[in-house]
């Protein structure tokens, strides 16, 4: 619990005509509460709650919803730095759109400063945090800076079984579909979010993202916004593994399997190299490695969730996180898929031509 980050949040300028109540929940029973925070709690300026067990984000957010009674619920991460007029921006939005489902502010990340943060930026890992700058409405958003209308939320809550990831997408899309409307973007409600762990590797985070996405894929309100897709690198390697016995029975040497595996991996690396050069205008092997590592960590998380749950028939399926229309068209292409297909084809031709 970092009082240097929390105190500015707890002392934001309060808009006229609104009652503001802070609820600070710590999901760590062993936390040492700073004296300044404890003092605010003892004076009744905030409500401080400490979970008896480490219960996860869904339980913690649900507890906050239940402990509060305001018409509007603002979720803020505890490590953000808010703009001084954050609450005024939300208050103005409430006055202008009192029947809104909720509002999504902008969560800015600092400029990338190393290979990990550059990889996260290039891979799109932080794009959804600032989507309010470019879209008027959204079906969901990260809960780092997001407000919900309690009356429209009703009795919907975060699913507590989603302990690894996907809980924000699941609830917010369910709430959006249940009300037949989306959350309004609020580009004036800005907070700054530091790079996770001071810019160190986020492989575990990407794994959790993938795992959570595969878990919620099975839910009807999510699945109808998914479609068949070309296999990613991990899925392609798994399919090759399944085919290996038949390849060997056909008399094809095992070295061919190894060669195909190498081509699959090399195509991924070369594609990321081209992405790095095209987008960031630099060709850095460490950056290419971090892009590949973090992207594939998310794919491994997705695959591992399917494998653990016996849902391998959901391989080669992607969620349309824009949630634009149900049953999106399958096998959609983008330039990087086309580039990867082209590179794979060239590598296959070069390999077998040499043979």
Model-assigned labels for residue ranges:
Residues 85-117:
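Conserved donor NDP-sugar-binding/catalytic core segment of glycosyltransferases
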Residues 164, 169-225:
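Catalytic donor/gating beta->alpha subdomain of glycosyltransferases that bind UDP-sugars
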Residues 237-309, 346-355:
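Membrane-embedded multi-pass helical conduit in multi-pass membrane proteins
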Residues 1-13:
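Short, well-formed alpha-helical segments that are part of the catalytic scaffolds
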Residues 105-106, 120-138:
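Short, flexible, basic/aromatic active-site loop/helix in glycosyltransferases
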Residues 25-35, 53, 80-81:
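A conserved acidic beta->alpha catalytic loop
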Residues 73:
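Short aromatic/hydrophobic "clamp" motif used to bind/position activated sugar donors
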Residues 51-68:
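Glycine-rich, basic loop-to-helix element that forms the pyrophosphate-binding segment
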């Amino acid at each position: 619990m970092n009082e240097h980050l929390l105190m500015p949040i707890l002392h934001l300028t309060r808009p006229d005509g609104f009652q503001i109540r802070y609820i600070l929940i710590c999901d760590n029973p062993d936390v040492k509460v700073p004296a300044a925070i404890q003092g605010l709690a003892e004076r009744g300026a905030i409500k401080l709650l400490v979970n008896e067990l480490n219960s996860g984000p869904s339980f913690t957010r649900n507890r906050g919803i239940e402990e509060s009674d305001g018409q509007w619920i603002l979720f803020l991460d505890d490590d953000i730095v808010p703009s001084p007029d954050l609450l005024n921006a939300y208050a103005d939005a409430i006055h202008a759109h009192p029947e809104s489902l909720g509002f999504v502010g902008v969560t800015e990340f600092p400029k990338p400063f190393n290979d990990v943060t550059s990889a996260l930026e290039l891979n799109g890992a932080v794009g959804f945090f600032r989507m309010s700058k470019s879209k008027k409405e959204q079906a969901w958003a990260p809960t780092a800076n997001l407000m919900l209308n309690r009356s429209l939320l009703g009795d919907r809550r975060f699913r507590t079984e989603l302990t690894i990831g996907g809980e924000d997408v699941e609830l917010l899309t369910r709430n959006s579909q249940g009300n037949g409307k989306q959350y309004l973007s609020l580009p004036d409600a800005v907070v700054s979010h530091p790079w996770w762990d001071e810019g160190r590797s986020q492989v575990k985070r990407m794994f959790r993202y993938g795992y959570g996405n595969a878990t919620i894929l099975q839910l009807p309100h999510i699945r109808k916004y998914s479609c068949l897709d070309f296999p990613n690198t991990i899925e392609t390697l798994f399919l090759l593994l399944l085919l290996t016995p038949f390849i060997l029975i056909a008399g094809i040497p095992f070295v061919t399997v190894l060669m195909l595996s190498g081509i699959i991996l090399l195509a991924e690396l070369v594609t990321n190299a081209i992405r790095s050069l095209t987008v960031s205008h630099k060709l850095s092997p460490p950056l290419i490695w971090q892009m590949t590592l973090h992207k594939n960590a998310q794919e491994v998380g997705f695959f591992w969730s399917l494998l653990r749950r016996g849902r391998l028939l959901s391989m080669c399926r992607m969620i349309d996180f824009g949630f634009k229309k149900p049953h999106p068209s399958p096998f959609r292409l983008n330039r990087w898929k086309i580039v990867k297909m082209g590179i794979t084809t060239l590598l296959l031709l070069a390999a077998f031509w040499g043979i």
